[in-house]
């Protein structure tokens, strides 16, 4: 009888011990882990893998290999909801990490906090697999070794058994913060040892002004984000104008304006893009006018906006349109340029004044403008 009672008690304590080993934060943290499906240019499934959110507005991390050659990608949350990957925000093919944004369909999503400090050798670690079940069996282990990456970041060797389906799952510390992105085991001991790229290192990946030439990013067909600073983003826009398709360039302009709504250059560039499409459909000119008006509202240097409006109208008239759009005449172009000159008489503005007067066959006025330019500091 005693033996019969002891067996259930032993099982009870074993279950209780197993549950005690699972940290309290696991239940909440597991909801930040998702599955990813990538598709090629023929919209055929390319790869499947894992990733996880690191911000409630849809910022996420995964492995670069999963996205290589992909034209689109979809994440599937632990609740089974599908959301598209909208932007690639940085990648490193050497350490196989990628940062991207998901177009979330909710106000916010569950997200993990990226650890600010690296765990010490010997520290406990937990790997959270993707799961649609209520219960989750996280893998436990230890940090075996910590090595430096790119100066301030880290790469980890873990004493932990990992299955292939756990690649790019988050590796957590005792506080429930993510410090690593699980990577495939390699080498002699793949049973008890696996690796993790630093989550902070993955977060440091970004788009720069020169990213258009980055081979790793070029191998991904999904749209790229903009650099985080205005100056870098403007250089990126300039370079993209000659290398992207018209449709992709327009989307990039929209992104710039969303990211930097107080920067007049975004509206000016998009206005010029709209105007270039207006020959066959004049509603594009309406859009250009709306952007010019917005540029005037936000610009700190309104003379630059007036100059660009005049310059565009001048170029429009030089193209000899069959029917002039509203007031886009040489006279209106001249009016805008002279408003720019009234604010700041820069030689480039006066040069444009001369060009417009010359086009109007006001040669005396054009000569007077050109003579001013010739006596300026740019002559």
Placement of each model-derived feature along the sequence:
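A conserved glycine-rich beta-strand in the N-terminal activation segment of trypsin-fold
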Residues: 21-22, 39-57, 63, 82-84, ...
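Flexible, gly/ser-rich surface segments that form the specificity/activation loops bordering the active-site cleft
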Residues: 21-25, 108-155, 162-166, 182-194
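C-terminal cap/linker of serine protease catalytic domains
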Residues: 22-26, 181-255
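Conserved active-site neighborhood of the chymotrypsin/trypsin-like protease fold
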Residues: 55-126, 133-137, 152-153
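Structural motif corresponding to the intra-repeat A-B loop/turn of tetratricopeptide repeats
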Residues: 243, 277-278, 282, 316, ...
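Short coil turns that delineate tetratricopeptide repeat
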Residues: 261, 300, 343-345, 375-378
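Residue-level recognition of tetratricopeptide repeat
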Residues: 272, 276-279, 311, 318, ...
């Amino acid at each position: 009888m005693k033996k019969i009672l002891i067996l259930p008690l032993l099982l009870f304590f074993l279950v209780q011990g197993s549950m005690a080993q699972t940290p309290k934060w696991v239940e909440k943290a597991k909801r930040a882990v998702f599955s990813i499906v990538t598709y090629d240019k023929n919209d055929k499934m390319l790869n499947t893998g894992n990733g996880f959110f690191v911000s409630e507005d849809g910022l996420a991390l995964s492995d670069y290999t999963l996205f290589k050659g992909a034209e689109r990608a979809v994440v599937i949350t632990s609740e089974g909801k599908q959301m598209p990957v909208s932007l690639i925000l940085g990648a490193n093919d050497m350490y196989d990490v990628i940062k991207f944004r998901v177009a979330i369909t909710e106000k916010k999503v569950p997200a993990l906090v990226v650890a600010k400090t690296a765990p010490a050798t010997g520290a406990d670690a937990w790997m959270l697999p993707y799961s649609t079940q209520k219960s989750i069996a996280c893998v436990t282990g230890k940090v075996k070794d910590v090595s430096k990456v790119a100066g301030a970041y880290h790469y980890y060797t873990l004493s932990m058994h990992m299955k292939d389906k756990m690649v790019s799952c988050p590796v957590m510390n005792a506080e429930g913060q993510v410090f690593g992105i699980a990577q495939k085991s390699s080498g002699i001991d793949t049973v008890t040892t696996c690796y993790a790229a630093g989550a902070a290192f993955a977060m440091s990946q970004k788009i720069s002004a020169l990213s258009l030439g980055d081979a790793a990013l070029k191998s991904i067909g999904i749209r790229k984000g903009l650099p985080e600073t205005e100056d870098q983003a403007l250089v990126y826009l300039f370079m993209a104008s000659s290398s992207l398709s018209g449709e992709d360039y327009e989307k990039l302009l929209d992104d710039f304006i969303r990211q930097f709504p107080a920067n007049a250059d975004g509206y000016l560039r998009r206005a010029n893009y709209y105007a270039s499409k207006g020959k066959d459909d004049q509603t594009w000119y309406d859009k250009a006018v709306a952007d010019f008006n917005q540029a005037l509202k936000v610009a700190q240097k309104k003379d630059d906006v007036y100059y660009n409006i005049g310059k565009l109208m001048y170029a429009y008239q030089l193209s000899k349109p069959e029917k002039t759009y509203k007031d886009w005449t040489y006279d209106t172009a001249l009016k805008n340029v002279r408003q720019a000159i009234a604010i700041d008489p820069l030689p480039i503005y006066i040069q444009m004044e001369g060009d417009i007067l010359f086009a109007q066959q006001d040669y005396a006025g054009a000569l007077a403008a050109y003579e001013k330019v010739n006596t300026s500091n740019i002559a």
